[in-house]
Amino acid sequence: MCNTNMSVSTDGAVSTSQMPASEQETLVRPKPLLLKLLKSVGAQKDTYTMKEVIFYLGQYIMTKRLYDEKQQHIVYCSNDLLGDLFGVPSFSVKEHRKIYTMIYRNLVVVNQHEPSDSGTSVSENRCHLEGGSDQKDPVQELQEEKPSSSDLVSRPSTSSRRRTISETEEHSDELPGERQRKRHKSDSISLSFDESLALCVIREICCERSSSSESTGTPSNPDLDAGVSEHSGDWLDQDSVSDQFSVEFEVESLDSEDYSLSEEGQELSDEDDEVYRVTVYQAGESDTDSFEEDPEISLADYWKCTSCNEMNPPLPPHCNRCWALRENWLPEDKGKDKGKMPEKAKVENSTQVEEGFDVPDCKRTTVNDSRESCAEENDDKITQASQSQESEDYSQPSTSNSIIHSSQEDVKEFEREETQDKEEIVEPSFPHNAIEPCVICQGRPKNGCIVHGKTGHLMACFTCAKKLKKRNKPCPVCRQPIQMIVLTYFP
């Protein structure tokens, strides 16, 4: 059997214990139309307490199924006795003040326990029963003296101001310690509605649809307990988060104080303390990668700056102190060497021509033979010298012809070399660079192409390039993130 209870909150989160104790125990006599409605759901008396009136109203709405299936806080009573009683076609149980007034219009106070600190009288209550709008609602007065919303949720029995002096004195001993504990807790935040009036709210309507709601422990008697979370399971599933009546949580802050020594008797469980594990990563001062902590780079790999004698790690091309470019960091351009080669060849050829080499002249050899014969024959020195001079004079036109012929052959050779150089320029230039060793290890050839996007750089071996990729290092040349490493083969 599904147990239904009438509550004070919008979603069944707070019971009628928030009502003043004097009003809960006040005997009221329903008017004939309301009495007829109550007796239709099992009421047998003529006078009831406020708890019983709320309970039977909830039973009536449950029995007649006047609530909306989707939005269960809306009650439709246009063609029902409840609509004639309240004078409205529909209402929401969240309209506190409106429903409070409609209920009290149909009640007459029979007996009332008047507490010593109560400022209301019987005539004042009768004005509320008559529906006077100029008077302030008694529960609205309670709202002005509520300590805080967090105290209302944690201690609903202390929210009423209609207590006897003896009851307030009994609870006054408990308040300082509990308030002190609340004061030491850090930034207690409570989300609640503006007013918590004595309203009738249906709780656990959905328990008719599933038998799982029996485990919530709803009491079968009409007395409403002060439990908050036991009866709101089904309503929390149906309503949105914004419809929940009260949610309390704590936010830790640096200014929160520790618990005082007077609270030694109030031991806190492990659930009260929450430990968060935070890992803090300290970033470097610069965006550049540090090679000082790399175990695979030894001091032998460092290079010395020629300007300031500073020892620098192998990868950065510039000195860390004077920002001078490292020597031999980039290979020399082939175009410059090719442009200089013809000039050097011309100079060498001109020197060769002047020295007399590569001149195919048979007379020059005869002159040398005659000189050797002159050294052997001492008698004919003068005659041999004159003959040698004459032979040199006769050989001048032949040597000039040979020089012209050799210069034409040199020009043809230079043209052939230039055509070969042009063909080499058309071919890719990286095979020549790949012959050089790896920039990092200086031992293996450059066969690991560092690819990033549609471009790549060939400046390291495959092993060193894979290490850079594995350590999430950027490209040493352009500082772009490395996408992949390609092992490069050359013919």
UniProtKB/Swiss-Prot annotation:
The gene is MDM2. Its main location: nucleus. This is E3 ubiquitin-protein ligase Mdm2. Residues 170-306 are annotated as: Interaction with MTBP. The modification Phosphoserine is found at S166, S190, S240, S242, S246, S260, S262, S386, S395, S407, S429. A motif (Nuclear export signal) lies at residues 190-202. Phosphorylation on Ser-166 by SGK1 activates ubiquitination of p53/TP53. Phosphorylated at multiple sites near the RING domain by ATM upon DNA damage; this promotes its ubiquitination and degradation, preventing p53/TP53 degradation. PANTHER family: E3 UBIQUITIN-PROTEIN LIGASE MDM2, OS05G0521000 PROTEIN. Residues 125-148, 164-179, 332-347, 360-374, 407-418 have a biased composition (Basic and acidic residues). It catalyses: S-ubiquitinyl-[E2 ubiquitin-conjugating enzyme]-L-cysteine + [acceptor protein]-L-lysine = [E2 ubiquitin-conjugating enzyme]-L-cysteine + N(6)-ubiquitinyl-[acceptor protein]-L-lysine. PROSITE patterns: SWIB_MDM2, ZF_RANBP2_1, ZF_RANBP2_2, ZF_RING_2. The lineage of its organism: Eukaryota, Metazoa, Chordata, Craniata, Vertebrata. A motif (Nuclear localization signal) lies at residues 179-185. It holds the Pfam family SWIB. E3 ubiquitin-protein ligase that mediates ubiquitination of p53/TP53, leading to its degradation by the proteasome. Inhibits p53/TP53- and p73/TP73-mediated cell cycle arrest and apoptosis by binding its transcriptional activation domain. Also acts as a ubiquitin ligase E3 toward itself and ARRB1. Permits the nuclear export of p53/TP53. Promotes proteasome-dependent ubiquitin-independent degradation of retinoblastoma RB1 protein. Inhibits DAXX-mediated apoptosis by inducing its ubiquitination and degradation. Component of the TRIM28/KAP1-MDM2-p53/TP53 complex involved in stabilizing p53/TP53. InterPro entries: Mdm2, MDM2_mRING-HC-C2H2C4, p53_neg-reg_MDM_2/4, SWIB_MDM2_dom_sf, SWIB_MDM2_domain, Znf_RanBP2, Znf_RanBP2_sf, Znf_RING. Interacts with p53/TP53, TP73/p73, RBL5 and RP11. Binds specifically to RNA. Can interact with RB1, E1A-associated protein EP300 and the E2F1 transcription factor. Forms a ternary complex with p53/TP53 and WWOX. Interacts with CDKN2AIP, RFWD3, USP7, PYHIN1 and RBBP6. Interacts with ARRB1 and ARRB2. Interacts with PSMA3. Found in a trimeric complex with MDM2, MDM4 and USP2. Interacts with USP2 (via N-terminus and C-terminus). Interacts with MDM4. Part of a complex with MDM2, DAXX, RASSF1 and USP7. Part of a complex with DAXX, MDM2 and USP7. Interacts directly with DAXX and USP7. The keyword Manganese does not apply. Residues 383-406 have a biased composition (Polar residues). GO terms for molecular function: 5S rRNA binding; identical protein binding; ribonucleoprotein complex binding; ubiquitin binding; ubiquitin protein ligase activity; zinc ion binding. It comes from the Eukaryota. Residues 1-110, 276-491 are annotated as: Necessary for interaction with USP2. It is found in: Nucleus, Nucleoplasm; Cytoplasm; Nucleus, Nucleolus; Nucleus. Belongs to the MDM2/MDM4 family. Keywords: Apoptosis, Cytoplasm, Metal-binding, Nucleus, Phosphoprotein, Transferase, Ubl conjugation, Ubl conjugation pathway, Zinc, Zinc-finger. Residues 1-25, 114-188, 211-237, 252-272, 332-418 are annotated as: Disordered.
